[in-house]
């Protein structure tokens, strides 16, 4: 499946949309008085690209069977997920202000019983990749079955005696780099590589921070790419705030039919608000009302220049 060309005009529109999403994140967190700031702001560009350019999805028909699946593993960054969903039409933008409130559909960690448009509930770090691997494996089994009947727009091809996938539907999984400290991720990496799940594309938010500090001081991950390649994955490094480069990385990933792909997206935590950027202390706290007002002024000033 090839994506539409990403023109300069479309990139500008995505930049504006990402800014809108960042503003919503700040407003949500200030209203809630709790939550995570750095990760959602840092992932806003990636969520924007996916929801407004990459994903096959239909907000008017959320249960569409041919939709791509997007699994959010590090569920604590859900303000950016909720904002992307609202701005793309899944529910009213005004509902974002109910984040973390009693009875709200927008829980502090995403929960499918409250918000049925979600593909997974997330909370325990490290669980999302295993969920995504299970979905990708199930799709592979279905693909092989449907290919025999020639009644689907997905198919398998034989290459060197093994079966690889060409598919119109992908399983995407977003991960935090800090959560790679959890061991069950590595079981999932092994399983996906062994089973050549070419319909699985994972994106790790390599922002180098976690709640207690810098990732490389707490539990070093590097050389991350080499480690994942050893599990028979294809690995792509990309700057996580360059829409053109991100789009090209996804296209490259979709061409890898015989391997799962990990995109290491190097992002700036707190991106868009200078006082929040690259400061691990903003991993798990919200801005105050005054800090939020200052952040919104900065974001609105940037939007006026796009």
At which residue positions do the language-model features occur?
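Short acidic, glycine/serine/threonine-rich loops at helix termini
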Residues: 82-83, 111, 184-186, 212-216, ...
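Cofactor-binding active-site loop characterized by glycine-rich and histidine/acidic residues
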Residues: 25-28, 40-149, 167-194
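Glycine/aspartate-rich loop-and-adjacent alpha/beta segment that forms the canonical ThDP
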Residues: 243-306
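Conserved thiamine diphosphate
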Residues: 216-249, 300-306
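A short alpha/beta connector and helix-capping loop motif
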Residues: 182-207, 262-264
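N-terminal capping segment at the start of a domain
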Residues: 18-34, 205-207
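Short Gly/Ser/Thr- and charged-rich N-terminal loops/segments
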Residues: 158-166
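Intrinsic-disorder-associated, low-complexity terminal segments enriched in Asp/Asn/His/Tyr and depleted
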Residues: 147-153, 160
């Amino acid at each position: 499946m090839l994506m539409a060309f990403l023109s300069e005009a479309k990139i500008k529109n995505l930049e504006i949309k990402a800014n809108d999403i960042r503003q919503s994140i700040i407003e949500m967190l200030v209203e809630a008085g709790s939550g995570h700031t750095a990760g959602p702001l840092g992932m806003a560009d990636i969520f924007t690209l996916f929801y407004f350019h990459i994903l096959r999805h239909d907000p008017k028909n959320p249960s569409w069977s041919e939709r791509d699946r997007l699994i959010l593993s590090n569920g604590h960054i859900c303000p950016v997920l909720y904002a992307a969903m609202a701005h793309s039409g899944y529910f009213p933008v005004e509902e974002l202000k109910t984040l973390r409130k009693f009875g709200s559909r927008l829980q502090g960690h995403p929960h499918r019983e409250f918000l049925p448009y979600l593909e997974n509930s997330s909370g325990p770090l490290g669980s999302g990749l295993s969920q995504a691997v299970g979905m990708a494996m199930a799709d592979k089994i279905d693909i092989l079955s449907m290919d025999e009947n020639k009644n689907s727009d997905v198919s398998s091809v034989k290459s060197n005696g093994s079966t690889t996938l060409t598919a119109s539907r992908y399983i995407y999984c977003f991960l935090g780099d800090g959560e790679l400290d959890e061991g069950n991720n590595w079981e999932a990496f092994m399983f996906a590589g062994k089973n050549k799940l070419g319909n699985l594309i994972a994106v790790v938010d390599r922002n180098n921070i976690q709640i207690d500090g810098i990732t490389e001081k707490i539990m070093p991950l590097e050389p991350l790419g080499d480690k994942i390649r050893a599990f028979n994955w294809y690995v792509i490094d990309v700057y996580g705030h360059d829409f053109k480069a991100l789009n090209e990385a996804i296209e490259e990933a979709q061409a890898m039919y015989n391997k799962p792909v990990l995109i290491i997206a190097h992002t700036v935590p707190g991106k868009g608000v200078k006082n929040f950027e690259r400061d691990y202390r903003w991993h798990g706290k919200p801005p105050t009302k005054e800090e939020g007002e200052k952040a919104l002024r900065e974001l609105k000033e940037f939007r006026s220049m796009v």
